[in-house]
């Protein structure tokens, strides 16, 4: 597990929501640390896998409609990517505001994928890019089975900070990885 993810697990506290739990690696690690965690994923197969692997509280739910109160919302492996586009960030922050307890926090990681546009001289050329360069469309495929395309967001730390502030939140980059990746803590601005 990358150092950034290990740091997030160490910092996670109280009642924890693991968003996009996948196969459950983070929830299982949190359980082994004696921490209380609820894992959610929209994939019924992912939830079944988590349960088979021993995740005690795994739910098939969408983050944007999930209800509950959490001290830590964990969004790892570029988990904030579920937002899809910058335009959906206000809805994301509204949901975070509903889910967080007073003093609660989001721990999320992402990558600034500007390096994809870097030329051989190290210049990053974003000319000709329509919209924000971190908004991508993914399509999963296994052998001949293809899923539907879906939007995914890679957000650079400056844009995340600006968007968070515009929606009543503070962002602090608390760790950086070796390849444009970072771990951020998002908390409510003091009102």
Language-model features: where?
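Conserved alpha-helix/loop element of class I SAM-dependent methyltransferases that forms part
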Residues: 1-15
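Conserved SAM-binding loop of SAM-dependent methyltransferases across substrates and taxa
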Residues: 23-34
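Core SAM-dependent methyltransferase catalytic element
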Residues: 167-191
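SAM-dependent methyltransferase
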Residues: 101-162
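A short glycine-rich, Lys/Arg-flanked "PGG" loop and its adjoining helix->strand segment in the class I
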Residues: 89-102
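A short SAM/SAH-binding and catalytic strip from SAM-dependent methyltransferases
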Residues: 70-90
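Conserved SAM/SAH-binding beta-strand->alpha-helix loop
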Residues: 43-44
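Conserved SAM-binding strand-loop segment of SAM-dependent methyltransferases
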Residues: 54-64
């Amino acid at each position: 597990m990358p150092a950034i993810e290990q740091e997030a697990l160490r910092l996670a506290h109280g009642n924890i929501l693991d968003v996009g739990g996948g196969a459950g690696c983070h929830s299982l690690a949190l359980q082994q640390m004696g921490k209380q965690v609820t894992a959610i994923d929209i994939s019924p197969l992912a939830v079944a896998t988590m349960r088979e692997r021993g995740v005690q509280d795994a739910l098939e739910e969408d983050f944007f409609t999930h209800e509950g109160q959490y001290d830590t919302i964990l969004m790892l492996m570029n988990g904030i990517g579920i937002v899809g586009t910058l335009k959906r960030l206000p809805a994301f922050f509204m949901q975070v505001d509903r889910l967080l307890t007073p003093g609660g926090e989001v721990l999320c990681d992402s990558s600034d994928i500007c390096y994809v546009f870097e030329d051989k001289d190290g210049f990053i050329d974003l000319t000709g890019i329509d919209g924000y360069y971190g908004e991508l469309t993914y399509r999963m495929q296994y052998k001949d089975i293809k899923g539907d395309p879906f939007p995914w967001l890679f957000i650079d730390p400056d844009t995340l900070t600006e968007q968070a502030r515009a929606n009543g939140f503070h962002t602090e980059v608390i760790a950086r990885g070796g390849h444009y990746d970072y771990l951020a803590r998002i908390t409510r601005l003091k009102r």
